[in-house]
From Swiss-Prot:
<dbReference type="Pfam" id="PF21089">
    <property type="entry name" value="PKS_DH_N"/>
</dbReference>
<feature type="binding site">
    <location>
        <begin position="1491"/>
        <end position="1551"/>
    </location>
    <ligand>
        <name>NADP(+)</name>
    </ligand>
</feature>
<dbReference type="InterPro" id="IPR018201">
    <property type="entry name" value="Ketoacyl_synth_AS"/>
</dbReference>
<dbReference type="InterPro" id="IPR032821">
    <property type="entry name" value="PKS_assoc"/>
</dbReference>
<dbReference type="InterPro" id="IPR042104">
    <property type="entry name" value="PKS_dehydratase_sf"/>
</dbReference>
<dbReference type="InterPro" id="IPR016036">
    <property type="entry name" value="Malonyl_transacylase_ACP-bd"/>
</dbReference>
<keyword id="KW-0511">Multifunctional enzyme</keyword>
<dbReference type="GO" id="GO:0071766">
    <property type="term" value="P:Actinobacterium-type cell wall biogenesis"/>
</dbReference>
<feature type="active site" description="For beta-ketoacyl synthase activity">
    <location>
        <position position="273"/>
    </location>
</feature>
<keyword id="KW-0808">Transferase</keyword>
<keyword id="KW-0560">Oxidoreductase</keyword>
<dbReference type="Pfam" id="PF02801">
    <property type="entry name" value="Ketoacyl-synt_C"/>
</dbReference>
<keyword id="KW-0443">Lipid metabolism</keyword>
<protein>
    <recommendedName>
        <fullName>Phenolphthiocerol/phthiocerol polyketide synthase subunit A</fullName>
        <ecNumber>2.3.1.292</ecNumber>
    </recommendedName>
</protein>
<dbReference type="InterPro" id="IPR014031">
    <property type="entry name" value="Ketoacyl_synth_C"/>
</dbReference>
<feature type="active site" description="For beta-ketoacyl synthase activity">
    <location>
        <position position="408"/>
    </location>
</feature>
<feature type="active site" description="For beta-ketoacyl synthase activity">
    <location>
        <position position="448"/>
    </location>
</feature>
Length: 1876
């Protein structure tokens, strides 16, 4: 202390005075216990203050002291105390080690950082080369944030643009990770990046990712921002089902666990900048506690928004000079960076056990928190020191034993000194001066990668420990003056430095600190290298490289990459090691190719060939598909021998050498020579005896070789003498017996050498037999293939026949053979053969064998002497044997392997198979090839035999070397962002679709092009009004014209010519608009705003920029003079109702405000005076254009057709309009059936024209009916029917169906052969009558698997007294869905028709009928999802006898109805929709003021609307129930309420403001106790009685019928069936004024995926019928979807299916209009659906889309399959958004991200393409293009006659109940439109 400062109190006063004087505090504000940061002391203030204190106290005071002692009291106490001993932290007490301290091995790493760093090796090179990746932000990165308001633009301009950025962050291999493009677009690119890098890290570790499936593998991923998620959610209209998972931080870890199916912990860690090092710490803990057995620790960081840059800029944290200068005096902040790193961790003992490469060992780690330090973001030196001590205690290591620390080192003026002081205090002090602690920071190379910073430093340190070198810390020139490096015994590594020699393993630490105060430190140590055991590392002579990928293109890319690597960085890696890693440390993939090579040169050449898809020695390209099961070994006869065969196999294939050695004794005994010596010496076999014995010995050894690699025969076939080897392999003979047979045969034949010959002819058998007819000594000896035969006979005659064949230009050649068997010359040898082999005792074969000795292939030969005597004489029926094997009744075989030294039969085999089974897939292989490398050839053929998975290869000892990881095939995936005004995609200008204007320079000397871009949104249209056509908003033609006219004006033009309107612009969803002017052409196009760059643009209008302003003005005046004067006989008419005229033509609304002042019409002219609004901006042309275009279309009021603009010859602009009134003069120049042509002039009264259109052509749209209507309308045309909600209401009218009834006398008895399975109640009687009708019935489910017809007779009684209607429905539903599942899995060529029988549901009087009623709804959905197996549903009368119904059912089965039929008194009725017409029977609904009304589901969106509707009708008391309770009323004002709760509360308050008392009750309406409690409570309180009910409760769960489960069905049926039954019992008929059941049209329309929901709603329909018959005003309202509300709010599938049928959803206003209308009629079930335009109006039926585009029946089978594959590939690729050429026909759709919505869309397109109805589960049952094409080929191909009737019936129907109803309404009799 100095004299002026004598102690702690003086120092405290001095500090207070200093702050008051220099910081600007008042004495009252200075709290000695408040942190200095809170008192306003900044980092730079601390530097100045430390200098003042150093001078005052005469000792060094560091700015760091202010962070260690952050208050005035703490700092004063510290500075007044004696200085601590410099070595006080030199040692850390070593704790006892235990299992929780077990070392952790780093076994794999992967990384992606800027600067082209894509792997750890690239990072190491980058660091050693002292490179930096820092640059300015890529231009496109912040584009979405530019062009905003001035204050935003100014802030962005002031934000630093320095950073370390990854390129192409929008690139991702979505296909590889089985993610659809749509989902990938919404995924945070951090998720995508981590997926790829994690896969690379696992491959680097040598762990095939597929092997981790369902393992206890943990994922710990550090990440701290999801800027992408924020960007994606900025535009609410773009939020979809993928958005939440795409933007959630947790999914960064979870998605990796999901993709790899990992079952260990999956945790996203956010501790800001220390996230990834904390992730490593948590991973180590999880391994030590055995929560997981393998851990993947990661960190990822991307910088997408300038917001965080701006925030750090504001606190001075970012370097203005763009460099991280850690520990340097010029440090001025950090630079933000991007990247990702992943490490794979195991317990060290596990890694050693598994032979893994141990890159480094984690000895210990620690994590702690700053707590309340000198500010939330301020570092705490004490906490940093504490985490260091804890880490080294955990590691069991003295701090002085660490050699290097990878510091956090951000490069800030005070952050660096604080960290250095902590490191020096704990780790540096006590070291020798010549052995300082070395420190550095990777941030000086890569910037601060924040959430990935810890793992970046960790990977760098592991690499340094591995290499024994430490890369330099960049930008370190002058030490930071606030860091006493010498005192702290520390040194910054400023050059490439060899690791210090310390006598112990290399050791290092890694630090990382989060800006919120979470600190982490990890201690690592050099790993011990694992070497193979001595003698086990010998390289094989030949290596097989398996190159795998998910597609052929990926295999090609991987092969090319490997070839490049092996010639470059991997040149020193042994070929065997490369093969080892590829074959045993990479995941199996669907496609793979192989390369067999003896040396590196051969391997590289093979890889290049594989990459190019070319053939080369040793190369097997990926198979296009599997040939199917079943392997046949084919043993050829003589002719395959060659000198040198087998020699290399003896040397390099142990299994072959062992087989030869085992065979050698018996071989020598029978042959008299050594097989081993002949093969080993490469000797030539001479003479028939040597040749035949040598070949069978070779064949038996080759068989063992194949079997040693796991390829074993399921069947064997022998060709001629090859049948001996086949018999041995089959187990009929021993090898010794086989050799004996061969020796005997060859010895007997030897004397005949040279006495006969054989010839191979390119002729089929009949032709050959005709050829040799004149040569009795010549025989057809071998049936080789359909095009090849072999003849045998005297040599001279054979030569003459060869000459004859060659004269016909056909192939013919002598066979090189000593003795010709299979001809009469063998007759003399047969007795001796029988005699010498008489004692042969063959066994029963253990492997199947087809003998080629007999013409009858079903002969089961005994391989005795007689057989072998016959074998040498009879012809060889090889062709027949192969054909039988390839198409046998017991199952076909698909892989044929010729066991020989050279292939003789492979071509004959494949010719035979393809001839017998065209289009089937087979493989025919040899074994060896003459004069080639035996081992390479065999291994190549071995690889060809493996088409499903790679062949087994030897697994050498570990460890394996790393090789390059999987090459990615990136495509762009990014959201369509909502740009600010003024930027690309800005909102269009008022009245036009023009947006931002860009001038595009051209290469040539031609003028520049011009581009205007805008974003059109439904809620921000550029015109004030609306313009709806059939309820769909369409951009008016006037706006389109105004757009291109305005663009022309900007370019100096005032006229357009050759205007052509091509497509309307629908404004019901956002679209991107582009206007392009190129030279004199101008066009307007649009595309979906939510699409991708590959989406198709639709062109809407084109035109030519024509005349100069002066030209157009003169032409305009001339045109006005010619057309603007009305004729003398013109007269002024009454002004018509413009809105009515437009409505008659289907148009609702005007886009601009203008009115008609006068209307003067004559024969061909019309002059209309129009008034414009006074507020119209001067020069606005839009309203004038709009008036002109609309009025021109109405130039003939008597013509009620709709006219749409088609073209304009010329349109010119003149002077601007200055007054509010103008006149539009229309001169009709042409009028025909196709349309009208009009000249138009617009001018202010008495002024020159302002607008002229010459030859404005309109095209007429005629709907085929008169759409004009009288008052009231006598009939309804399609336009009004689609717009007037009262026309939406229909009942179901049951009309007689012309189906023959076999019960009528004289009915023809028809026999319909085919098995029938009958399931359910009272089936015996039905069986008896069906059997009499010619069917083959089977009771219960015995015959379901083979039945052509399946009849399900529904139960009528519950299973027990306690079974409720819900229980009953769930039970029966489960039975039927299981039945559908079974039938759907049957082959397409074995179709079945499913029928369901119910009783009494039509009337629903009996309780049993009500119980069964749900089946009607389920039936419609089965019909929609599985039209191929649906027959129909028949409802019998409640007392009908099933036995009597049998004959009628027999007739129905013959032609499935696809519908619901009702049979009463012998008459069959079918449903049709009938509109509700006539005089109402009831008055409008009025509620009683003294009653209450119950709405179940009343707190939902629909329920609250219905509550409002009842209030409009006088209801004063409402009881609203819902499953979720509202909060207490005292909490209704809380800001914490979510949006949905707030909406409900606001709606209730609005009702209460109207004087309505609302009682909101939480109750489960399906629970009888809940409803009883509600009613009991009301009774106790004396509440008003409930006089009306709306049952609106319900939930849905979209599931295909084949996927429905009992639990899911119960969940849906509970509120509907259970709830309605409870209410029915509580409020019996007569107790209420009305009982409305809000059901769904899904119950009758058959919407796919709505099985449970449709079934539940059909029950409501039946209950309404039942109560109505009891006199209660009960109505079931079968709605289509309410637009944007209720259960269909997000049901895209429902909307798409409605659109497919020609219908649509309805608005709430339309719904209530329809409700009020139908409530006046006596209707129990009202179907509320907008009807489509009548079928046949355009000459086609409602299902014209099902007309086949091709006549499949006239096409060949192969052509059908090819056409189907091409068409389906195109359809599926378009929906999945993948390039068609990249869609592998064998790739499962699920791997491409197929979901149910996509499947439905594909199904619709496929139906149009194929021309038949298809199942909803089609894509899931046939999950590849190839399998789907094969399935459909069976559906469309001709069938046998016995199936024709059924197949046509199954495929010709419309398939959906909705289609059927829409069809029938057109044929409904007049009485159907009766008053109901």
């Amino acid at each position: 202390m100095t004299g002026s400062i004598s102690g702690e109190a003086d120092l405290r006063h001095w500090l207070i005075d200093y702050l008051v004087t220099n910081i600007g505090c008042t004495p009252d504000e200075v709290d000695p216990d408040l942190s200095l940061a809170d008192l306003g002391v900044s980092s730079r203030d601390a530097v100045v203050l430390s200098g003042e204190l150093s001078e005052l106290l005469g000792r060094t005071v560091s700015p760091i002291d202010f962070w260690e002692h952050p208050t005035i009291n703490a700092l004063a106490a510290y500075l007044a105390a004696p200085e601590p001993s410099p070595d006080s932290d030199a040692a850390v007490k070593r704790g006892a080690r235990n299992s929780l301290d077990e070392p952790i091995a780093v076994v794999g790493m992967g990384c992606r950082f800027p600067g082209g760093i894509s792997c750890p090796e690239a990072l190491w090179d980058f660091l050693c080369e002292r490179r930096s990746s820092i640059s300015q932000v890529p231009p496109q990165r912040w584009q979405p944030f530019e062009g905003g308001p001035p204050e935003v633009a100014a802030a962005l301009a002031r934000t630093t643009r320095w950073g370390s950025f990854l390129p192409d962050i929008d690139a991702f291999d979505a296909e590889f990770f089985e993610i659809s493009p749509s989902e990938a677009d919404k995924m945070d690119p951090q998720q995508r990046l981590l997926l790829e890098v994690a896969w690379e890290a696992l491959e680097h570790a040598g762990i095939p990712p597929g092997t981790l499936r369902r393992s206890a593998t943990g994922v710990f991923a550090g990440a701290c921002l999801s800027e992408y998620g924020a960007m994606a959610s900025a535009d609410l209209s773009q939020v979809d089902g993928w958005s939440n998972s795409g933007g959630a931080m947790s999914i960064i870890a979870n998605r990796l666990s999901y993709f790899l199916d990992l079952r260990g912990p999956s945790v996203a860690v956010d501790t800001a900048c220390s996230s990834s090092l904390v992730a490593i710490h948590l991973a180590c803990q999880s391994l030590r506690t055995q929560d997981c057995h393998l851990a993947i620790a990661a960190g990822v960081n991307l910088l997408l928004s300038p917001a965080v840059f701006r925030g750090f800029d504001q606190v001075g944290a970012l370097s203005p000079t763009g460099q991280c200068r850690a520990f340097d005096a010029t440090a001025d902040g950090f630079v933000r960076g991007e990247g990702a790193g992943v490490v794979v961790l195991k317990r060290l003992t596990d890694a050693q056990r598994d032979g893994d490469r141990v890159l480094a060992v984690i000895c210990g780690s620690a994590v702690n928190q700053d707590g309340r330090s000198n500010g939330l973001m301020a570092p705490n030196p004490a906490a940093q020191m504490a985490v260091l001590r804890a880490a080294y205690t955990n590691a069991g290591m003295q701090p002085s034993e660490v050699d290097y620390v990878e510091a956090h080192g951000t490069g800030t003026l005070l952050g660096d000194p604080i960290e250095a002081r902590a490191l020096g205090t704990v780790l540096g002090r006590g070291r020798p001066e010549d052995s300082p602690l070395l420190i550095g920071s990777v941030k000086t190379n890569l910037g601060h990668t924040e959430a990935a910073a810890g793992i970046a430093g960790f990977i760098k340190t592991v690499l340094a420990v591995q290499h024994g070198q430490i890369p330099p810390n960049q930008h370190f020139e002058t030490a930071n003056p606030h860091i006493p490096f010498t005192d702290l015994r520390m040194k910054v590594v400023d050059t490439q430095t060899e690791w210090p020699a310390t006598g112990h393993p290399r050791r290092a630490g890694v630090s990382s600190f989060g800006f919120g105060g979470t600190n982490a430190h990890v201690v690592i140590e050099q790993g011990q290298e694992v070497r193979p055991a001595p003698g086990q590392g010998l390289s094989p002579a030949v290596s097989t490289l398996v190159v795998a990928g998910k597609t052929m293109q990926r295999v090609s890319a991987t092969a090319g990459m490997l070839a490049d690597w092996m010639e470059g960085p991997g040149a020193d890696v042994a070929l065997a090691d490369v093969a080892h890693t590829l074959n045993h440390h990479r995941s199996r993939q669907p496609k793979f190719g192989t390369v067999v090579a003896r040396d590196r040169t051969q391997a590289i050449a093979g890889l290049r060939a594989l990459a190019a898809g070319q053939h080369a020695p040793g190369v097997v390209n990926p198979a296009e598909g599997s040939p199917g099961p079943g392997t046949v070994f084919v043993y050829s006869g003589r002719g395959s021998q060659w000198a040198g065969m087998g020699r290399q196999l003896l040397a390099d294939e142990p299994a072959f050498a062992a087989a030869v050695a085992e065979l050698e004794p018996v071989f020598v005994e029978q042959a008299g020579f050594s097989l081993h010596d002949v093969l080993a010496n490469g000797e030539e076999l001479v003479g028939i005896e040597q040749i035949q014995l040598g070949l069978i010995g070779m064949q038996l050894a080759l068989t063992e070789l194949w079997c040693s690699y796991g390829v074993r025969p399921d069947l064997v076939i022998g060709h001629s003498m090859g049948e001996v080897a086949a018999a041995v392999v089959a187990g009929a003979l021993t090898p010794a017996e086989g050799l004996r047979v061969t020796a005997t045969r060859s010895r007997l034949m030897a004397p005949l050498s040279g006495q006969g010959g054989m010839a191979l002819l390119e002729l089929d058998a009949p032709t050959t037999e005709a050829l040799i007819a004149d040569f009795p000594q010549v025989t057809l000896g071998i049936y080789n293939s359909p095009r090849q035969t072999v003849i045998a006979g005297p040599t001279e005659q054979i030569d003459e026949l060869i000459a004859r064949v060659r004269a016909q230009n056909r192939f013919a050649s002598r066979v090189n053979i000593e003795v010709a068997p299979h001809n009469p010359a063998m007759d003399a040898l047969q007795p001796a053969m029988r005699s010498e082999l008489a004692d042969l005792t063959p066994r029963t074969p253990t492997i199947g064998i087809i003998s080629t000795t007999y013409a009858d292939l079903h002969t089961q030969p005994v391989f005795d002497a007689e057989h072998w005597a016959t074998n040498m004489r009879n012809p060889v029926h090889f062709q027949q044997a192969i054909a039988s094997a390839g198409s046998g009744a017991d199952g076909a075989y698909h892989t044929f392997i010729e066991i020989s030294a050279h292939p003789l039969l492979t071509q004959a085999i494949i010719d035979t198979l393809h001839s017998a089974q065209p289009g089937a897939r087979y493989t025919s292989l040899g074994t060896l090839q003459r004069d080639t490398d035996d081992v390479v050839t065999f291994r190549t053929n071995l690889n060809k035999a493996h088409t499903i998975h790679p062949p087994h290869t030897p697994h050498p000892p570990e460890p394996h070397p790393p090789i390059p990881t999987t090459p990615w095939q990136h495509t762009r995936h990014w959201i369509t962002t909502k740009y600010p005004a003024g930027s690309v995609g800005s909102a269009p200008r008022a009245g036009t679709l023009l947006g931002q204007h860009t001038t595009v320079a051209t290469v040539s000397a031609s003028p520049p092009s011009h581009l205007w871009q805008a974003r059109l949104a439904p809620d921000a249209k550029p015109y004030q009004g609306g313009h709806r056509f059939h309820q769909v908003e369409v951009v008016p033609a006037s706006v389109v014209l105004h757009t291109i006219l305005s663009a022309a004006t900007e370019l100096g033009y005032s006229a357009l010519s050759e205007v052509r309107f091509e497509q309307p612009i629908f404004a019901d969803r956002p679209r991107l608009i582009q206007v392009v002017a190129d030279n004199r052409a101008i066009s307007l196009a649009s595309s979906p705003a939510a699409g991708t760059p590959s989406d198709r643009w639709t062109r809407h209008v084109t035109a030519q920029l024509s005349s100069s302003p002066s030209d157009s003005a003169s032409s305009l005046n001339e045109h006005h003079r010619a057309n603007g004067q009305p004729p003398e006989r013109a007269h002024r008419d009454l002004i018509p109702d413009l809105a009515e005229l437009l409505a008659m033509r289907g148009i609702d609304g005007l886009p601009f405000s203008w009115t008609v002042a006068s209307w003067t019409q004559h024969s061909s002219n019309l002059t209309v005076a129009i008034d414009l609004p006074e507020a119209l901006p001067e020069g606005s042309t839009g309203p004038l254009l709009d008036a002109a275009v609309h009025l021109a279309a109405l130039s003939d009021v008597a013509d009620s057709r709709l006219y749409v603009p088609a073209s304009i010859e010329q349109i010119s602009l003149g002077d601007v309009v200055t007054g509010p009134r103008s006149s539009v003069t229309l001169n009709r120049t042409a009028h025909d059936d196709d349309g009208i042509t009009v000249d138009v002039t617009v001018a202010a009264h008495g002024e020159v024209p302002s607008l002229s259109m010459r030859s404005l052509r309109y095209r007429a749209l005629d709907f085929g009916l008169d759409v004009g209507r009288a008052q009231p309308p006598a009939s309804t045309g399609p336009v009004e029917a689609y717009c007037d909600a009262t026309n939406f209401v229909h009942t179901i009218d049951w009309q007689p169906q012309t189906v023959p009834d076999a019960t009528h006398p004289g009915a023809e008895q028809v026999t319909h052969p085919g098995p029938v399975a009958i399931i359910g109640d009272d089936s015996a009687a039905l069986c008896e009558t069906l059997e009499g009708a010619g069917y083959q019935p089977a009771v219960m489910s015995d015959g379901v698997s083979q039945a052509r017809y399946v009849v399900y007779v529904a139960d009528s009684d519950p299973a027990g007294a306690d079974e409720t209607d819900v229980d009953f429905a769930v039970r029966i539903c489960t039975e039927i869905t299981g039945l559908v599942r079974t039938l759907a899995e049957r082959d397409a060529d074995k179709p079945a028709a499913l029928w369901i029988l119910t009783r009494g549901v039509h009337e629903s009087v009996a309780p049993s009928a009500l119980r069964q009623s749900f089946l009607w709804g389920l039936a419609g959905v089965i019909a929609a999802e599985h039209p191929e197996l649906w027959g129909g549903l028949v409802d019998l009368a409640i007392n009908d006898d099933l036995g009597e119904f049998g004959p009628a059912l027999a007739e129905l089965l013959a032609k499935p109805s696809k519908s619901i039929l009702v049979r009463r008194d012998g008459v069959v009725l079918a449903p049709a929709l009938a509109p509700v017409r006539g005089e109402p029977a009831r008055k409008s609904l009025q509620c009683r003021p003294d009653a209450a009304y119950l709405i179940t589901g009343g707190l939902g969106a629909l329920g609250l609307l219905m509550a409002d509707w009842l209030a409009d009708r006088g209801a004063h008391r409402l009881v609203l129930t819902g499953r979720t309770p509202l909060p207490p009323r005292r909490d209704w004002q809380l800001d914490t309420l979510d949006t949905e709760l707030r909406r409900r509360i606001d709606a209730i308050r609005a009702l209460e403001m109207r004087g309505v008392t609302v009682e909101a009750v939480a109750a489960d309406v399906g629970c009888r106790e809940d409803v009883q409690a509600l009613l009991a409570a009301r009774d106790r309180d004396g509440a008003a009685p409930i006089r009306g009910i709306i049952h609106a409760a319900g939930i849905t769960n979209d599931q295909l019928v084949t996927s429905m489960t009992g639990d899911a069905v119960r969940q849906v049926m509970w509120p509907k069936i259970g709830g309605s039954q409870v209410l029915h019992d509580a409020f019996p008929p007569g107790s209420v004024d009305f009982f409305y059941l809000t059901a769904s049209a899904a119950g009758i329309f058959g919407i796919p995926g709505q099985g449970s929901y449709a079934a539940a709603n059909s029950y409501l329909d039946a209950l309404a019928r039942a109560r109505r018959q009891q006199g209660c005003h009960t109505m079931s309202l079968d709605w289509v979807a309410w637009r944007g509300l209720g259960l269909a709010a997000d049901a895209q599938l429902v909307s798409e299916e409605l659109a497919r049928m020609g219908s649509r959803d309805i608005t709430p206003s339309e719904a209530f209009t329809a409700w009020e209308f139908v409530d006046g009629y006596d209707v129990a079930q009202a179907v509320v659906v907008p009807m489509p335009a009548p079928a046949g109006a355009d000459g086609s039926g409602a299902n014209a889309y099902l007309l086949p585009a091709r006549n499949w029946s006239v096409m060949a089978a192969t052509e059908v399959r090819s056409e189907l594959e091409q068409g389906l590939r195109r359809i599926i690729a378009a929906e999945l958004r993948v390039p068609e050429k990249e869609l592998d026909t064998d790739r499962p759709f699920a791997e491409l991200g197929l979901n149910s919505l996509m499947a439905m869309a594909i199904r619709r397109e496929a139906e149009q393409f194929v021309g038949i109805e298809l199942s909803a589960t089609m894509l899931f049952n046939h999950p590849t293009v190839k399998s789907l094409a094969s399935y459909l080929a069976k559906r469309v191909a001709p069938h046998d006659v016995s199936q024709d009737n059924q197949i046509s019936a199954l495929s010709s129907s419309a398939g959906s109940v909705l289609d059927s109803l829409f069809d029938r309404i057109e044929s409904a009799p007049p009485e159907a439109e009766r008053s109901v």
